[in-house]
């Protein structure tokens, strides 16, 4: 049985590349076949045995507040600085409310629930869910030494080799994410828009390695722009439904 019962969802982003679709709502509320990304994700988490979900909010946060009123397992922590900071600050802003193993997720994901079980059952306390190449645009590429994180970047030229792509679901131990918080604190003045994935790379070393669990044909997508949404509707969702 998994010892992880908490999930953190990073949901503060503006979603500006989706233009009119996210002017008045967060991108987690985009719908696929009548259900929002966020509510589908919450359902997957609850089914996986997660009983506490903390959502880091920002843009149009009232939508998440309304969602939390329907789920006793959900609480929200709002970041007043969401417009000028990155995903790592959204996570850092929750630091006083977290001290247990957790799953860290992005809010704009459409994914098969098997990925959650893969992480929850993985023997490493710190493990990133990864996939094979998606060719979706805006990928975060991962370099490993076989099964441990070495580097991550959206720029292929910054990596020695590309072994996988970041899905946006990670299992983290308190020790690792508190190291990420400390790194965020030390770099905030110069890098306020720090992404959480860069903080993971910064704290991953020989003494604190982060595993990478790759599922080659894993059905998932992040929805950051119109092309991602069309891929979700035409390719990813049919694969999830039929599996």
What is each PLM-predicted segment?
Residues 2-32:
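Glycine-rich N-terminal loop/short-helix segment of MobA-like nucleotidyltransferase
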């Amino acid at each position: 049985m998994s010892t992880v019962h908490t999930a953190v969802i990073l949901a503060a982003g503006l979603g500006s590349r989706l233009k009119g679709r996210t002017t008045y709502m967060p991108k987690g509320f985009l719908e696929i076949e009548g259900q929002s990304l966020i509510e589908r994700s919450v359902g997957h988490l609850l089914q996986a045995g997660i009983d506490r979900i903390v959502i880091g909010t920002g843009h149009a946060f009232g939508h998440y507040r309304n969602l939390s009123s329907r789920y006793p397992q959900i609480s929200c922590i709002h970041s007043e600085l969401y417009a000028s900071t990155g995903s790592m600050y959204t996570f850092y802003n929750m630091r006083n409310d977290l001290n247990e193993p957790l799953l860290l997720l992005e809010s704009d994901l459409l994914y098969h629930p098997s990925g959650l079980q893969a992480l929850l059952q993985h023997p490493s306390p710190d493990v990133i869910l990864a996939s094979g190449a998606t060719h979706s645009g805006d990928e975060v590429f991962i370099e490993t030494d076989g099964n441990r994180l070495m580097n991550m970047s959206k720029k292929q030229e910054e990596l020695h080799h590309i072994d996988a792509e970041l899905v946006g679901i990670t299992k983290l131990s308190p020790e690792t994410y508190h190291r990420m918080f400390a790194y965020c604190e030390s770099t905030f003045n110069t890098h306020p828009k720090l992404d959480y994935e860069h903080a993971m790379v910064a704290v991953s070393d020989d003494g604190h390695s982060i595993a990478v669990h790759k599922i080659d044909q894993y059905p998932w997508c992040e929805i950051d722009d119109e092309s991602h949404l069309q891929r979700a509707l035409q390719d990813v969702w049919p694969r999830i439904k039929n599996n």
